[in-house]
From Swiss-Prot:
This is Phosphoserine aminotransferase. L-glutamate binds at residue 42. InterPro entries: Aminotrans_V_dom (IPR000192), Aminotrans_V_PyrdxlP_BS (IPR020578), Pser_aminoTfrase (IPR022278), PyrdxlP-dep_Trfase (IPR015424), PyrdxlP-dep_Trfase_major (IPR015421), PyrdxlP-dep_Trfase_small (IPR015422). Coiled coil: none annotated. GO terms for biological process: L-serine biosynthetic process; pyridoxine biosynthetic process. It comes from Shewanella sp. (strain W3-18-1). Pathway: Amino-acid biosynthesis; L-serine biosynthesis; L-serine from 3-phospho-D-glycerate: step 2/3; Cofactor biosynthesis; pyridoxine 5'-phosphate biosynthesis; pyridoxine 5'-phosphate from D-erythrose 4-phosphate: step 3/5. Pyridoxal 5'-phosphate binds at residues 76-77, 102, 156, 175, 198, 240-241. Binds 1 pyridoxal phosphate per subunit.
Length: 363
């Protein structure tokens, strides 16, 4: 069977080595005679898995000791709610920086749940010569007392990524669902990091939360026990039955990433993949991208065909060539190639070859 390269934005492809290992031990995990999906989450064997998973993630991301690592239910949207409920209390105030679809959704959820708390927002995307560009505000010039400032460094729908570190006098809460472990960051700059697993960590249904200890002292109005960070810390992410298979696969992804040299190593590969694809897009007028070079996403490359009537044919022929899930988000249309950690360089080479041949045929 010919190779299939899955460019889906999420759930995304997983490393082949991880999938093969899961396949091999699906019916007999760790010599237990049963699947990891069937074993008790409170068994010593599974608890050992969770401890190793946390240790590996801490090592990969250089997470300081004063941060808790939580493995929680749900995805990013669940964390939109959890952040508000855990940190704002009755009279808190928060600032949301809006750079695209997902930060806008986080803002909408915060406004819905805030009650008497105050939610402020700033749009940080401007048009520069017709292209989307991020302009980070000087937060030190804002006269306010915020519990936190929320932002999303990578917008999967819009193909926008913020590479500059945010400088804030208030705790930073960041949605890293699509960039976690794709490049190195300084975790100590953040009050809380959350990430849905289904892009760079594992299958959907699991979220990773990395929270600084002092954040847990903020006033809380959280009503849902499974979204209570304090309860999750107290019970080692096992207040109730966790998504065990997703946790197992996340552990295997962490181990795989360590085996290939860690985040520093994969970051170089990710940069190479993105540069190769953007070079193809920029090399002729057949394709176009609507983001300034400094804010082009490395994880989610969005592009349009100059002749949109060819979109259907492009997707049809790409599918035949083994290049799947390239259709852009319904909000923006066009195409989108998601280049998460598990996407091999060979997949991008195959996509570029196809795009060049398609352009030559229909130009």
């Amino acid at each position: 069977m010919s190779a299939i390269y899955n460019f889906c934005a999420g759930p995304a492809m997983l490393p082949t080595a991880v999938m093969k290992k899961a396949q091999q031990e699906l019916l007999d995990w760790n010599g237990q005679g049963v699947s990891v999906m069937e074993i008790s989450h409170r068994s010593k064997e599974f608890i050992a898995l969770t401890k190793q998973a946390e240790a590996d993630l801490r090592e990969l991301m250089h997470i300081p000791a004063n941060y808790h690592v939580l493995f929680m239910h749900g995805g990013g949207r669940g964390q939109f709610s959890a952040v508000v409920n855990n940190f704002l209390g009755n009279d808190g105030r928060a600032l949301y920086l809006v750079s695209g679809q997902w930060s806008s959704s986080a803002l909408a959820e915060a406004q819905k749940l805030a009650g008497d708390a105050q939610i402020d927002s700033l749009n940080i995307v401007e048009k520069h010569n017709g292209l989307n560009a991020v302009v980070l505000p000087d937060l030190h010039k804002i006269d306010a007392d915020y519990r936190y400032v929320h932002y999303c460094p990578n917008e999967t729908v819009d193909g926008i990524e913020i590479f500059d570190e945010l400088d804030s006098p208030w705790p930073i809460v960041a949605d890293l669902s699509s960039t976690i472990m794709s490049r190195e960051i300084d975790v100590s700059r953040y009050g809380l990091i959350y990430a849905g697993a289904q892009k760079n960590i594992g299958p959907s249904g699991l979220s990773i939360v990395i929270v600084r200890d002092d954040m847990l002292k903020l006033p809380s109005l959280v009503q849902s026990s499974i979204m209570d960070y304090r309860l999750a810390v107290e019970h080692d992410s096992m207040f109730n039955t966790p998504p065990t298979f997703a946790w197992y696969l996340a552990a295997e992804v962490f181990a795989w990433l360590k085996s290939i040299g860690g985040i520093a190593s994969i970051a170089k590969i990710n940069q190479q993949k993105a540069q190769m694809l953007y070079q193809c897009i920029d090399s002729n007028t057949f394709y176009r991208n609507g983001v300034v070079a400094s804010n082009r996403s490395q994880m989610n490359v969005t592009f349009q065909l100059a002749d949109e009537t060819l979109d259907g044919e492009f997707l049809k022929q790409a599918q035949v060539a083994g290049l799947v899930a390239l259709k852009g988000h319904r909000i923006v249309g066009g195409m989108r190639a998601s280049l998460y950690n598990a996407m091999p360089l060979e997949g991008v080479i195959a996509l570029v070859k196809f795009m060049n041949e398609f352009a030559a045929k229909y130009r």
